[in-house]
From Swiss-Prot:
Pfam families: Hydrolase_4 (PF12146), Methyltransf_20 (PF12147). It comes from Escherichia coli (strain K12). Coiled coil: none annotated. One of its GO terms (molecular function) is lipase activity. This is Uncharacterized protein YnbC.
Length: 585
């Protein structure tokens, strides 16, 4: 069958109202259910991917390819995105759109991505854990070769001093491919975007380092194609990434002599043979979900948690540094209100969290206020405040969704702390008929009740003491909630059995069509420091956390009877907020 296809040209609107251009090549066979989404290299656009559709020769498959924001025919300043995290969210929204447009589930989607596009996709898989069938990554740009010494720190310093600016790429087509026609077309294509915003280039490095270090969180079937003679990106980071992947189905292929444009090389038939074989294997079998059943005992995060619980080597440089930090906190912490509160109630307590939400540096003197400001501006607490913003956005979205379905909106938060984020989100929501806040701490309940009274919300908000891990208590909640919120709770407990009990109770309480909003912590850059220096609410013991990958957290929610439908994550990749709908069993 002739496979040459002319694409339809359309625009897709993102959640921040940016119009992204995309091409769609419908399947040539009626009733086809396979979908492949293509992501182009940096600087390029979807018009340069026509040969992939033609040469893969899959007439039973629909293809989609976008022009990334700021590229090709898409809107936005050339080469710019507000952040790499925003571009990763674009990936999530576009793939979900492609699946919906083709009327298939995500499990029927395979993604093929090159270079910078491959980094976006790898980050999306890590941060969002989408249930697609698999992915092919070609020469991901985890570490771009900057030939000027100290270019990266110089760019970071200049960005800090000057703000946003753009760097032009002077890479010529002859360094990208041996295919003279493709090289010439790259040099002369008016839609090629030579500029890249400095924030995106710096984000690309930082995010790539995070994804490589934590690649064990990626469990989807993955094929990695590495160009053997790449002038643009380093090889070793790609290998490090691949070796840490935990998918039971993964392949690495090194293509000798290939330049950076792996899928546009002169001898690209070699790469296409590898892709065709891998994709055929993916579609030949039913989509398989990774087994997270024993993740809290045998997974990499469990091993890391046990190592952190044991502490650093005595008198090692790390141990001495942590001892110094603990001494300094005891000596100076009394002057900082935030540090003093954390040392008194636990840095993971509801009281500490509420203080972080308020974000008002306080202390007994100017020095104490300065220390407090530094404390509140740590990346972890900035992530917590962004999590609060994401919670409020999804709570409002959930209320609107329930109201649109004709369901009464009855809210419960099973571990509300002081309840500030819930009260802020629901203060002006007339559709909400009942709000129940619960917490295990008597102090949190008392302070939460005081906050409710101060806001004049006592008529429709109740705050009671309760155990968020007691399935019988949760199953018996009255009236039955249609919106349940669990924020910042499961992250504090390494064992999954407690989480399963809590989710089982909520699944019994929430009627089909109801909504669960839950948070996650798939990664944290300060995990070791927190374990070595800060104390928890658990009798002053060290605050040692086990991070759960987004895939693990989503699997617990799915097994309890909920289907995840949307997610938010901060720009540092630390905290996620997800929304799931109760299935009708």
């Amino acid at each position: 069958m002739e496979n040459s296809r002319i694409p339809g040209e359309h625009f897709f609107t993102t959640s921040d109202n940016t119009a992204l251009f995309y091409r769609h090549w419908p399947a040539l066979q009626p009733g086809a259910k396979k979908v492949i989404v293509l992501f182009h290299r940096g600087h390029e656009h979807s018009g340069r991917l026509q040969h992939l559709v033609d040469e893969l020769a899959m007439p039973d498959t629909a293809f989609y390819a976008w022009d990334a924001r700021g590229h090709g025919k898409s809107s936005g300043p050339r080469g710019y995105s507000p952040s790499l995290a925003r571009s990763v969210r674009d990936v999530d929204e576009f793939v979900r759109f492609a699946a919906s447009d083709s009327q298939v589930g995500l499990e029927e989607v395979v993604v093929i991505a090159q270079s910078v596009g491959a980094v976006l996709v790898a980050t999306w898989i890590h941060d969002y854990a989408p249930a697609i069938r698999g992915l092919v990554l070609a020469s991901p740009a985890f570490k771009v070769k900057l030939y000027v010494p100290l270019a990266r720190p110089a760019l970071a310093l200049w960005h800090r001093l000057r703000g946003l600016f753009f760097i032009n790429s002077y890479v010529k087509g002859r360094y990208l491919t041996h295919d003279r026609q493709r090289g010439a077309s790259f040099n002369n294509d008016p839609l090629i975007t030579r500029a890249i915003a400095v924030n995106i280039l710096l984000d690309l490095y930082k995010t790539s380092e995070r994804i490589i270090r934590d690649a064990a969180a990626i469990t989807l079937p993955t094929q990695l194609l590495i160009s053997g003679d790449d002038y643009v990106v380093h090889r070793q980071p790609q290998i490090d990434f691949y070796q840490r992947l935990r998918s039971p189905l993964k392949e690495l292929h090194l293509l000798p002599g290939f330049y950076h444009d792996t899928l546009g090389e002169e001898n690209r038939a070699l790469a296409f043979e590898k892709m065709q074989s891998f994709i055929s294997r993916l579609y030949a079998n039913k989509s398989q979900k990774f087994d997270y059943q024993h993740e809290d005992c045998t997974g990499p995060s469990a091993d890391r948690w046990r190592l952190l619980s044991g502490g650093p080597v005595p008198l090692s440089p790390v141990d001495l540094a942590y001892r110094f930090m603990r001494k300094a906190m005891k000596l100076f912490g009394t002057h900082s209100s935030g540090l003093h509160l954390g040392m008194s109630t636990g840095f993971d307590s509801g009281s500490s969290l509420d203080y972080v939400y308020q974000n008002q540096p306080q202390g007994s003197n100017a020095f104490g206020r300065l220390v407090d400001k530094i404390y509140l501006n740590s990346v972890g607490w900035r992530g917590i405040r962004q999590r609060k913003t994401h919670l409020q956005i999804l709570i409002k979205q959930a209320v609107a969704d329930l109201h649109a379905k004709g369901l009464a909106v009855r809210v419960v938060d099973i571990a509300a702390g002081h309840g500030r984020y819930v009260l802020d989100a629901l203060a002006n929501e007339p559709a909400v008929s009942d709000i129940l806040l619960r917490d295990y701490s008597e102090l949190n309940v008392a302070q939460g009740q005081e906050m409710i009274a101060q806001r004049g919300m006592s008529g429709r908000v109740r705050f009671e003491q309760g155990d968020a891990f007691n399935p019988e208590e949760l199953s018996a909640l009255t009236p039955r909630p249609t919106l349940a919120i669990v924020s910042g709770l499961y992250e504090l407990f390494p064992e999954n059995e407690q989480v399963k009990n809590s989710l089982a109770g909520l699944a019994n309480a929430i009627e089909p069509g109801g909504i669960l909003i839950y948070t996650g912590q798939p990664w944290h850059p300060q995990l070791e420091m927190i374990a070595g220096v800060l104390t928890s609410h658990k009798d002053g013991k060290p605050w040692v956390m086990r991070v759960r990958s987004q895939g693990e957290m989503d699997s617990l929610v799915r097994d309890a009877g909920f289907d995840k439908c949307t997610q938010r994550i901060d720009e540092w990749g630390i905290f996620t907020v997800s929304m799931a709908v109760r299935r009708d069993n």
